[in-house]
Structures are given as structure tokens and as C-alpha cells.
Amino acid sequence: MMEITRETMSFTSTTPSARAPLGGRTTGNVTSQDRMLKIVTEMRSGAGSGLSPFGQNAASTIRDSREREKKEMSDLNDRLASYIEKVRFLEAQNRKLAADLDALRSKWGKDTHNIRNMYEGELVDAQKLIDETNKQRKDMEGQLKKMQDELAEMRRKLEDATKGREQDRAKIDALLVTLSNLEAEISLLKRRIAQLEDEVKRIKQENQRLLSELQRARTDLDQETLNRIDYQNQVQTLLEEIDFLRRVHDNEIKELQTLASRDTTPENREFFKNELSSAIRDIREEYDQVNNVHRNDMESWYRLKVQEIQTQSARQNMEQGYAKEEVKRLRTQLSDLRGKLADLESRNSLLEKQIQELNYQLEDDQRSYEAALNDRDSQIRKMREECQALMVELQMLLDTKQTLDAEIAIYRKMLEGEENRAGLKQLVEQVVKTHAITQETDTETMRVVKGETASRQSFQRSAKGNVSIHEASPDGKFIVLQNTHRAKDEAIGEWKLKRRIDGKRENVYTLPRDFVLRAGKTLKIFARNQGVASPPDQLVYDAEDSFGSGNNVQTILFNKEGEERATHIQRQSTA
């Protein structure tokens, strides 16, 4: 009976990290007599090469297990007795592969238990990492929800501020309308006051004229009184003259009578007496007639003058009373208008003060509104960056979890497929390919593996204003600037972009004069020979072929005054 030996393979880890970085490419050779097993892994982002843990374990355990294989032969022969009927057709092949089977199956002993314990520990660590990741994810989701609530609160406050601003504007418009109405009313009152003052002036002139006419009438009255006295004197004189003439006539009559009496002839005496009587009667009638005419004329003229003076005086008194009443009324109205004007002026000053206070309040509200908008935009940018970082980190954790799940499944298949040794090489290659596939999805960090070392890159950026450094190539090929404002263009002409490498070397690029970065747009600046200039979206830094790369790279944007407006810090650490 032919003996068929069964050997076991064990894998142990001697690296500090207990697991090779995912996505690396390692090559290891395992040689046993005339059979060599080659394990190949791919490494997409590494910078060096080394033996994988499987190759190192295979090479180290083959030499140590040869003496032990001889002791385990008898035990393995007993265990493989049940397979004799199944492998009779492989007897010739078994003789040829006996040495290889002894070398390969010698690994499946206590080393398998060590591998199981090692990967069970890694599974526990991976489960803890998954739990911590889920916990962090829940915390981040809580923080995100809290930030969303704060954002909703800020939006509500912004809407309230906007409504208050609209109400203030409506109130200011109403006050302006009231002010314009009051100003129009004040202007109308001023015109009415001017008209009333003109009317008062005219009435004063009319009153002065009436006073002048009254004075003239009084003068005329005095003159007429003097004339009346003069006429009365003339009448008295005439009466006296008449009395004198009467006396003279009486004397003449007496003389004539005397003469007549001397005439002895009765006919003559009678004749002269009759003639004298007739003459006296005629004279008396003529005198009475003249006297009556003069008296009637004087009386009618006097009555007429007195009536005219009385009528004119009554009219002047009436007009003067009317003028006094009108002046009194106008003075009362003027006093009322002046009081109303004072009230309107005080109200106008109060309204102007209120308008000034509302303008100040409006300016404060506008400044608060702009500050709230800027704060909200900065918080939104910060939350977007944090969300992006959380999404990237979450994607990394999910990729790590998928990788660990794939490794666990493959190692479980390897442990369960202990009896079937034909697919060992395919399983190892599947593990390696899985590593390579999962490494390609890692976008946040880049691992460079050489032997047992790895490096990690991280970045941090900040901005004061709307212009930020959106992206900076780690190899220094390009830098991207972004205007985060949705409506405002930014003039960044003659701004300086400095890139400091490891605190030593520094490259400076000055943007063209009068360059404007449009709202919501980006500007990509290439190093020399790394891109084509296409303003305003692309520019070229002609001084260097690269902006520079290193372990600690700081990219800083300065304005024309030398103030720092945006930063982008890249760090690369080695573990």
C-alpha cells in the first residue's frame, strides 16, 4: 500500500502592523525541493516592494518544519488511510509529489491555530473599529442634524430680519408720505400766512387811507365850520347892514316925511306918502326876498354839508369797525396758524428724528443682515467641508469594512478548505486581488508602502472672505481658487499666491492686474508645462515646472495689501 502524507501550512505575522497595507504589491517565493509557490500582490499607490506575510511565513516555516515532518509522517499516514480508495489513480503522481506534499502539508499544524488566533484578534479589532465608526457616524449625524437645525434657525431669523426690514421700509415709506404731506401742508400754511400778511398789509394801507380821508374830512368839516361861522358872520353883518340901512331909510323916510309935512298941499303929502309907502314896501319885499333866498341857500347848503359829513363819518366809522374786526380776525387766525405751524414744525422735527433713528436702525439691520449672511455662508461652507470630510471618512471606513469582510470571508474559506489543497494558490491570488481592488476606492489618503512603512496625507484649508483655495495638487502641478459667493464677483488682481515647502523653499505667483474671479467660478493655475492658459478659467505659472511638494506644504493667498485671505495646508506623515 502506498503512503500518502498530508502536510499542514501555517501563516504567522512578523510585521508590526499585523497586516500588509491594502492595495500594495508584494512578491514572495516559497521553495520546497523542486516545487516553488509564487504569491503576487498588487500595490497601486506604494513606492517600494517587499515580501508579503504569506511568502515570509512560507519561507520561514519550511526550514523549521522539515524535522517535524518526519515525526508527523506516521500520524499523517494514519489520518490519510481513509483516502486510499479515492486516490489509487494518483499513486504514480503521489510518488512524484510526496516530497512537495510533505513540505506543504507540514504547515497545517499548530501554526494554523496561531493564524486563526491572529485573524480572530484582527476580526475583533475590525469589529471594534466598525462599532467605533458607527458610533462616530451616529455622532456626526447628530452633529449634522444639530447644524441643520441651527441652519434652519438661522434661516428663520434671517426671514424674520427680512420681514422686519420690509416692515421698517413700509413704516419709513408711510412716515415719508406723512412727512411730505406735512411739508405740503406747512408750505400751504406758509403761503396762506403770506397771503394773510399781504391782506393785513393791504387792510392797513386801506385803514391808513381811510384815516387820511377821515382826517381830510375832519379838515373839510373844520373848514366848513369856519365857512359856516364866516357865513354866519356875513349874515350877521348883512343883518346889521340891513338894520343900518333900515335905520338910514327910516331916517330918510322921516326926513322925507318931514319934508312932506312941510308941503302944505294935501295932495302932495298924500302922493309922497303913498310913494314912500310903496317904495318902502318894495324895498322891504325885495330885502325879505333876498334875505329869504340867502337864508334858504345857507340852510340847504349847511344841511347838505352836515348830512354829507355825517354820512361820510358814519361810513368811515363803519369801515373802520369792519377793518378793526377784520384785523382782529386776521390776528386771531394768524395766531392760530402760528401755533399750528409751531406744532407742525415740532411734529416735523420729531418725524425727522424718527426717520433718522429708523435709518440708523435700518443700517444696523443691514449690517447685521450682511453679517448674518456672511456667517451663514461661512457656516454652510464649513458644514459642507465637514460633511465632505465625514463622507470621505465614512467611505474610507466602509471600504475598510468591505475589505475586512472580504478578507474574513477568504480566510474563513482557507480555514474551511483545509482538506482541499488544490485551490490554495487561487485563494491567495484572490486575497491579493481583493486588496488591490479595495485600495483603488480610497480617495482621501494615499499609502506608500516599502517593507513595513506607510504614509498618510491630510489637508486643512480656511478662508477669510469669498475667495478660497479649493484644491492644491500634492505634486505641485496646479492650484485651484474658488469664489464661493453666488452673486458677487471678486477683484483679485495683483493678489499673491505663496507656496511654502517644509518651511524652507517658497514659490510666489502674482495674479494679473485687473483680474476678476466671477461669482461661483473657479480659477485653475497650472505650473509650467502642466497645462494651457485659457483666461479667465486657467492660468499658467511660468517661473517653475512645479509649485513644489513635500511633507509639510503651506499654500497661502494674500491680497494687494499683504493681508492673508486663504490658506491650504498639506501634511504627510509616515508610520
From Swiss-Prot:
Ranges of residues in domain IF rod: 69-422
SMART domains: Filament (SM01391)
Single annotated GO MF: structural constituent of cytoskeleton
Iron found in the keyword field: no
Localization (cell): Cytoplasm
Region (Disordered), start-end ranges: 1-30, 45-72
GO cellular component, one term: nuclear lamina
Region described as Linker 1: 105-118
Record-stated family: Belongs to the intermediate filament family.
Name this polypeptide is given: Intermediate filament protein ifa-1
